[in-house]
Each structure stands twice: as C-alpha cells, then as structure tokens.
Amino acid sequence: MVTVEEVRKAQRAEGPATILAIGTATPPNYVDQSTYPDFYFRVTNSEHKKELKAKFQRMCDNSQIKKRYMHLTEEILKENPNICAYMAPSLDARQDMVVVEIPKLGKEAATRAIKEWGQPKSKITHLVFCTTSGVDMPGADYQLTKLLGLRPSVKRLMMYQQGCFAGGTVLRLAKDLAENNKGARVLVVCSEITAVTFRGPSDTHLDSLVGQALFGDGAAAVIIGSDPMPEVEKPLFEIVSAAQTILPDSDGAIDGHLREVGLTFHLLKDVPGLISKNIEKSLVEAFRPLDISDWNSIFWIAHPGGPAILDQVEKKLALKPEKLRATRNVLSDYGNMSSACVLFIMDEMRKNSAEEGLMTTGEGLEWGVLFGFGPGLTVETVVLHGVST
C-alpha cells in the first residue's frame, strides 16, 4: 500500500522554481511624455484650465518618463466622451474595451515567451493571469487559454484588482506551483491597460492627475518550472524565496475603487516615505538566511511606482546609482505598467547582462531582489539567484 507521504514525495520537484523565458508586448500606439499634457488637456476639453495644465506639465516633466504606450487613441476617446470626463458613467465602454484587449495583449507577450522557451505549448500545465484592468467571467485566463490554444485541462488562476505589487505576487504563486508539482510548467501573464483609469483632470483631486502622468500599457509573460531539462531549457533566474507584508501605518496610502466611472485611483503624498522607511526590514528578513547585508552587493528589480519612490529608496539605502539602472530605464521607456513592470525590468536586466558580457543574468551578481509595491500598502519581496550566462 502506498502512503500519502510517498505520493507527496513523488509529486514534488527536486530543485527551485526557475524562470525559463520572458516575453513582453505593448500596444502599437505611444505618447511622448513632453507633449502629453497638450494632448491630454485637448482630448478632455480642459484647455481652459491653464493653471492645472501647468501643474500637469510639471508632473510629466518630473516623471523621468520619456514615452508611454497606450491602447487609447484620440479616435477612441472621441467616440467615448464620458471616458474623457473626470467622473462620468463610463464603466460599460471601458469594460467592452478591456475584456477584449487585455487577453489580446497578454497573448502577444505569452507567444514571445513560449517562442523563447522553445517547447510545445502543450507542455504548459498551469496558467496564472493577472490584471488590474476590468473584471469578467469567464476571465482573461479563459480567454487567453482559447487564444493560445492551450490544453483545456490547463490549471488556471485568475487574479483581478491586485495593483502594482502583483508582479511579485505572481512569482510567489508560480514558485509554489512549480516546486510542488513535478514537471509543472507555469505560464504567468500580467497584462495592463489604462483604459480603466483614464479620466479628465480635476482641480480638487490632484492624486488622480498623478496617475494620468505615470500609467502606461503593457503585458509581460514568463514561463516558470523546476528542474530545467539540460540542453533543452535555458534557466534565466532562480526564485529562492518570496514574502508579502502590509506596511505599518499605511492604511489608505494607495487605493483603487471600481465604480460606474471606471477605476478611481487615490494616492497619499507620503507613499515614497512609507516605502523607503520600511523597505530595509523586508530586505533584512529576506537576506538574513544568505548572510547578506550589503544592499549594493545584490542586483535590484523594483517596481517603479514613480520617480520619488525610487529616489527615496536609493537615498535611504545608500544605493549606488547603477543599482536601479534597469528599473529607471523601464520607467523612462514605458511608464508605470502596474503588475507588468517588474517582469519588463527582469527582461531588460538579463538582456543588458548578456550584451555587456557579464558573468550572470543579474548584472554579473549572484543574488538579487525583486520588489512589488502597491495598494495596502503591500510589499512583495522576492529573492532571485542570477544564472551564469
């Protein structure tokens, strides 16, 4: 008679969860950050709000963003004037867009990841799909399964309304799935579109305007599995540990509410301070088992919520400027793409490391950290191990 313990042992993988491929995608349309205030105030019929436009111009100029990709074009916005108002009923129009576009953009990223992986998609056993853009049943996970032609028996998990920390969450979940299911290959997709949050400016709610200056569209996909097949699968990073915490005294610091007017976004001014004040505690807990306490000795992938967060974290931890290079590059080229950002940064880092002939995928370093920050205020801390290039 076989025991439960023997069954469990046979079910488990031997080695750690490993990232085997990364793919990214954006809509074709993009906006130039320097001229975006002109576009934004024109399409929202707000050009008479001269002082507010000047404030928004300063926000965009100080954002450290050069361009952002957006599904929303001037033509789409002209057809949907309620989306351009500050608070007008518009959820139906927004939903009609995102339920189609979110899986579609996710498919582009997933297709690229599968191509890099080089294995038949029939080997994908699990799908984790994450978006903060819209809600539907069956979900974007179901739609993507159909679009990609995955097996109907693929085990799906749909994550809606998590926000900007979720790029860390999906890795934490995929790690547990891969390590507890021998032979599992988990396709993780984060797909985000600002069609749910776009709205006109308000003199009284400047935090909403901050979101309009920062958010962009993008999708990223990774394939994760344990015990990579030698000579067949190429490991990029190993996921060593993953943790989540709610920061103290941070209630209401970042909120999002799905309403008739779309997804409203609320942000308190002290978010960068809350994160920078508490981040070292998460680092100490994550790296104590590895006997690491020099934060410049590891590689960094941090969700670029905005330039102030990165600046304050850098200052608080006395990080060398190059530590956040990949993070700042993604912020500059894409803006804040919510959950997808950290996966874009991971992709940028491994490509740069290879191009520069560095010893590992993590900028030549062995150990690294991936941080997700978002509503709660919630922090995801993922310890990564760079792989030899």
From Swiss-Prot:
Belongs to the thiolase-like superfamily. Chalcone/stilbene synthases family. The keyword Cell membrane does not apply. This is Chalcone synthase. PANTHER family: CHALCONE SYNTHASE 1, HYDROXYMETHYLGLUTARYL-COA SYNTHASE. InterPro entries: Chalcone/stilbene_synt_C, Chalcone/stilbene_synt_N, Chalcone/stilbene_synthase_AS, Polyketide_synthase_type-III, Thiolase-like. The gene is CHS. The active site is at residue 164. Keywords: Acyltransferase, Flavonoid biosynthesis, Transferase. The keyword Aminoacyl-tRNA synthetase does not apply. GO terms for biological process: flavonoid biosynthetic process; polyketide biosynthetic process. Pathway: Secondary metabolite biosynthesis; flavonoid biosynthesis. It holds the Pfam family Chal_sti_synt_N. Its EC number is 2.3.1.74. The primary product of this enzyme is 4,2',4',6'-tetrahydroxychalcone (also termed naringenin-chalcone or chalcone) which can under specific conditions spontaneously isomerize into naringenin.
